[in-house]
A protein has these predicted regions:
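Active-site rim/loop-helix segments in enzyme catalytic domains that contact anionic ligands
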Residues: 1-71, 102-105
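Metal-dependent de-N-acetylase/amidase catalytic core
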Residues: 56-199
Length: 199
């Protein structure tokens, strides 16, 4: 599920003069390409502007996410984490948690993981991190990241940065042993936030 519309993304090079509406269409096209390359079972694009997802008074995003959760019944939900550097990502996470709390206990997934992309969760003890081994299919990872041309050519080398971050996580995770994986991604277990509304 892609929550926001991509209108406000940074741009340069051939995308420099694209309007926000044009960028929205480019980003949708890229998401559809990624779904084909990755052979996703489904791709849902909510098309919500960032300013709305960050506005806690707007019920529409929560209603949409809730409907998707009820229709798909996931066992694990992967979203952004609450310490994400990107404020839109934090907004998405808050709306996802809100929607999860509206599910009855029987409808809820078994686990909620807040994934980290921008940084390395250095503030967490390693044993508390959710580690996801991304050693396999490195070629597919490169292909998926490479689909997002508007960001890469447009001034943000997410492809190189993401793959480099994964490799660095794998190498720096254990200081006194050899690497156990070729790529690691980190997350935060946020299941308690779904189940305990007092948090």
């Amino acid at each position: 599920m892609v929550v926001t519309d991509g209108r406000g993304s940074p741009r340069n090079s051939i995308y420099e003069n694209y309007s926000d509406d044009e960028m929205r269409l480019v980003r949708f096209k890229e998401q559809r390409k990624a779904a084909m390359v990755g052979e996703f079972a489904a791709q849902i694009m909510l098309d919500i502007p960032s300013k709305i997802i960050k506005d806690a008074s707007r019920p529409e995003p929560v209603d949409d996410i809730l409907a998707i959760l009820r229709a798909t019944k996931p066992k694990v939900v992967y979203t952004h984490n609450l310490a994400d550097k990107h404020d839109t990502h934090v907004g998405v996470t808050l709306r996802v948690i809100e929607a999860l709390r509206k599910l009855s206990p029987a409808e809820r997934p078994e686990r909620v993981v807040g994934c980290e992309v921008w940084r390395a969760l250095d503030w967490m003890v390693d044993s508390d991190k959710v580690t996801m081994d991304l050693s396999r299919h490195e070629n597919l990872q490169f292909a998926l990241l490479g689909v997002f041309d508007s960001q890469i050519v447009g001034g943000k080398r997410y492809d190189l940065a993401s793959m480099g971050r994964r490799r660095a996580n794998a190498t720096y995770f254990e200081s006194h042993g050899v690497d156990d994986s070729q790529g690691l991604s980190y997350g935060v277990d946020m299941t308690a936030l779904m189940n305990d509304p007092s948090l």
